[in-house]
């Protein structure tokens, strides 16, 4: 099966040569400058204008990482839910201005919920219900601007919890995202399923993948091949994925190596 063109997550200060390399081939670009706490409560119009100018020649897929610090999508307090929805709506306004096809949001599920499914059987359903309330207006807005919200695993150890949330909320603009590093951390520390199993569990709903490597100890955001993830197996799992998800390298340093890393992954897709 044909795979999506690989791209990268960037901030405005990314090296010009890397940005130009992405733009020259119209590779997907994911903007990550709008995630800091309280940022969406300030005047960010200049930053949006800078991005619009920087991206004016880019015709590839554009995405945005939405805000997540302190914004628990499973929060059951009504007043907090309103604030979280407001933050997501503000981020979606930015998506509209930058023509973003998707926005990444973080999953509220974790190992405590997984371990206590029988002890506290209402927790998962209550979390999904809260998600539905929080995302109701953002999903309406997303559908109006042609944007998809993609729910990324963060502390998840049971990939079926996110799947159940997507299925229960049942909105065409809500899909799944997988962060390979997060999945490998859960596998290494909590004996959660491996990255390839996270991918297979998302089949039919997977719209986006953050490709990053880790050592199994911390959320390193290293380039693929620099940690302990078995990349040929991950690529094999993505090859048979029917949904053709956006494939985004998400790293924190050594951005100048992104072209080589993309070439490496693309070589695996060709095997």
Protein language model regions, located:
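Generic enzyme active-site microenvironment
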Residues: 28-31, 63, 150-151, 177-178, ...
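Active-site acidic/histidine proton-transfer and metal-coordination neighborhood
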Residues: 74-175
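Active-site beta-loop-alpha junctions enriched in small/polar residues
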Residues: 9-13, 32-36, 67-69, 108-110, ...
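N-terminal pre-domain/capping segments
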Residues: 1-92, 96, 270-271
């Amino acid at each position: 099966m044909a795979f999506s063109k690989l791209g990268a997550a960037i901030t405005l200060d990314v090296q010009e040569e890397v940005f130009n390399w992405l733009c020259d081939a119209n590779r997907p670009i994911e903007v990550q400058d709008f995630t800091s706490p309280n940022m969406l409560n300030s005047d960010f119009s200049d930053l949006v204008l800078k991005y619009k100018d920087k991206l004016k020649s880019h015709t590839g897929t554009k995405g945005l990482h939405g805000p997540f610090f302190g914004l628990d999508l499973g929060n059951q307090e009504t007043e907090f839910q309103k604030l979280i929805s407001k933050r997501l709506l503000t981020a979606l306004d930015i998506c509209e201005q930058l023509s973003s096809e998707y926005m990444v949001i973080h999953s509220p599920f974790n190992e405590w919920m997984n371990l206590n499914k029988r002890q506290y059987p209402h927790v998962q359903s209550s979390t999904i219900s809260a998600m539905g309330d929080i995302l109701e207006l953002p999903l309406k807005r997303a559908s109006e601007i042609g944007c998809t919200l993609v729910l990324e695993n963060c502390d998840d150890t049971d990939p079926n919890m996110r799947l159940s949330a997507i299925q229960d909320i049942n909105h065409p603009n809500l899909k799944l995202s997988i962060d390979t590093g997060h999945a490998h951390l859960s596998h290494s520390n909590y004996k959660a399923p491996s990255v390839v199993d996270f991918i297979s569990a998302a089949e039919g709903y997977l719209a986006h993948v953050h490709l990053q490597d880790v050592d199994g100890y911390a959320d390193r955001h290293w380039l693929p091949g620099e940690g302990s993830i078995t990349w040929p197996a991950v690529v094999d799992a993505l090859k048979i994925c029917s949904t053709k998800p956006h494939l985004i390298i998400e790293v924190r340093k050594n951005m100048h190596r992104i072209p080589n890393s993309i070439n490496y992954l693309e070589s695996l897709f060709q095997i």
